[in-house]
Amino acid sequence: MRGTWGRRGAPRLAGALVALLVLLAPTDVASAAPATRAVGPVHAPAADLCASLEAALQSVQAQIEQHNATPNVFDESQAAALAAYDAEAAALTAAQETAIANLQSCLDAASLLATDNSTVDLKPPTEKARQVLQQAKDKIGNDWTPPAAPAVGKNWTVPKSSPPRALYDALRSGNPPELGAATLRGQARPAVGADDPAYANRTFLTAADGLSAASADHIIPIARQIYLPGFVQLTPDNMYVVTRAPLNFQWLSFKANLSKQSRSVAGMTGVDPRWQAEQIELEDETVRALQDAIDRLLASQGTPRR
């Protein structure tokens, strides 16, 4: 709320920024700037990923409520108090706009990473995993630059002597997780005996656990994800969820997954050409979505991409 003068025998005059009466009225997340920053309800899986940003917005809005509850009528001898009151109002308005923008960027990233046609959720790391990731990230200098892409047919790798190797090992551990019969990109785990789209005249065999011999494949391997612009600038939580994003998982047969390794499907031989072309298109689509999510997460952190 904007401060006002109180004059004896005269009407009270509102300050120049009386519009803050509207801007500083916190209701729900979307109401602060409905024209440009309509932040919707925070639902799972975004709830965990964006929880700290939602809390930051709520904290600013609590300060706004406290500000608006403060007496705001000043007489002519209180010019300094009026100026301080209005300066605080302006600062809170700016803080709220920043908090809304950060939360919206996070929600947008979560929407990209957690596809509607997957039964796998985005989950934050454990505290122990978070600490390991932070320690690994700290080993990467600000002057480190990713290497050039490998030749077609060669694997994406993170050499043992490379600064991000510890980060790669931490992100690769237990990844992909055991997904059982999860639905990935709209496809249930293939049944035993189902046709293998990667190879003509082959079917999914039976694995030792009785399920089909199918693997949850990273469409874009973790080694390549680490080299995406801005990835190593993400927080440990954000790096963790990007490398485990439902968007980036698909079912492949054991044979196809073993043949693909950590390279592009373009380098595979002996596979169905139509399937290969579709996979190359899927890789291009997925890497664009991952980069978009990384950029949005960096924005939510307030981190300019190097």
Task: Show the residue positions of the predicted features.
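Extracellular/mature segments of secreted proteins
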Residues: 56-64, 112-124, 261-262
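Short, charge/polar-rich alpha-helical segments
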Residues: 35-69
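Amphipathic alpha-helical coiled-coil segments
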Residues: 63, 87-116
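Secretory targeting and sorting signals
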Residues: 1-34
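Catalytic cores of phosphodiester-bond-cleaving enzymes
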Residues: 243-306
